[in-house]
Amino acid sequence: MNAVRRAQAAVAALAVTATAGCAGAGAIGGSENTLVVAIVANPQMQDAIELSERFEEENPDIDLDFVTLPENESRAKITASVATGGGEFDVVMISNFETPQWADNGWLVDLQPYIDQTEGYDAEDFIPSIREALSHEGDMYSVPFYGESSFLVYREDLFQQAGLTMPEQPTWQEIRDLAAELHDPENGMTGICLRGLPGWGENLAPMNTVVNTFGGQWFDEEWNARLDSEEFREATKFYVDMVQDYGIPGAAAAGYGECITRYSQGQAAMWYDATAMVSTVESPQDSVVVGKNGYAPAPVVETDASGWLYSWSLAIPESSDKADDAWKFISWVTDKDYIELVGNELGWERVPPGSRQSTYELPEYQEIAEAYAQPTLDSLSTASQEQTMVEPVPYPGIQFVGIPEFQDLGTRVSQQISAAIAGQISVDEALEQAQRYAESVGESYQEEQ
């Protein structure tokens, strides 16, 4: 089965989810001058909507129509639209998971000619690991709105009060022990926040980094499914147990959005998640813990590092007939000038992090980001399979498996993990079913060897 057919089959599996995800998205479409922009409803994207009037003032012949959806719904809807040539979106927010696959399938406009012709855009300024992750055969097919790895944020003030010290490079067992010390639910404080919400980009993102550093893998180099291995089982049980013992109430339904709210409102002592969290955690408008936080590398077990690599990026579907105007918006919202606009208008803690190297050279950003700028860059620089995995694997990706089937496979497995967190099934039962899902996918690749 070639790549396009694999992708089309994967999209078919997502069709029901995508249809359900349309509800609440709002009417799609507009005049001939309207660009329809599909984005994920995360804080940095909401800032872009707030500032988009500036773009429309500079480009009076272009109107912007934003379609925002929660992460899981957004992934399914955008995937179904782009893969089938639906044509309802002119700009889509995707990631380094979709970009190389969709570029290879011919579903995205090659942005390199636009980049090369746009004076002052400076794509060489993008953080190298992010730029490479969004490229196919040397050309960029999406450009980063923000980039991220993962690290641990913790309340320095609570640690000091309890006489605790965060190790320079913590292990997961050390984090569990610290969570146990700080867990005080009777006073509204949980030891740690970890995602439990189903979704291959929700609970599986942090959990897969735990699996990796424990020595687990989804498939070995012969495409044998390995979700029933001792390493995968040990990592999953560790993650589920910690969420159940020291996580937030209702963790099985808590994703990035719930954790960022919980931590920012002073209700969690630690949180392991995306480095992009800093835009909210350190924002005086959104957080009550500004200036009280320390940042540590992603916890490890058997590896030197374990942070993921991810970028929310913007691309133009081949089905759009407004590529030139779409690039005008994309280049505006991912340019150095936009970074400064956010800083000056909304606050420097709100700038999209992890995309451009020059952001970390701005004096205003350096001043407010002293605690987390270097940890962010360090996490991005160590986010590779070589440094975060024990065993070699036949697929790209750290917190995801970079194959078309993973959107469906990951979603199914994530539902099993969430059910285990909720106490509906055991970890063994969850992984027994997950292994069957993975075996079906692995067998299709074995047939091609």
Where are these regions (language model features)?
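Short, solvent-exposed loop/beta-turn-alpha elements that line the ligand-binding surface or hinge
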Residues: 112-126, 168, 196-199, 214-234, ...
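Extracytoplasmic/periplasmic solute-binding protein
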Residues: 136-145, 150, 173-225, 232, ...
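C-terminal lobe and pocket-closing loops
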Residues: 116, 276-289, 302-411, 447-449
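Glycine-centered hinge/linker elements that transmit conformational signals in sensory
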Residues: 178-181, 222-253, 294, 298
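Conserved N-terminal structural module of periplasmic/extracytoplasmic solute-binding proteins
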Residues: 2-105, 116-123, 252, 302, ...
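Pocket-flanking alpha-helical
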Residues: 49-53, 72-110, 123-142, 152-153, ...
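Bilobed periplasmic-binding protein-like "clamshell/Venus-flytrap" ligand-binding domains
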Residues: 68, 141-142, 183-199, 335-346, ...
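Hinge/lid segment of periplasmic solute-binding proteins
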Residues: 96-149, 203-206, 210, 290-296, ...
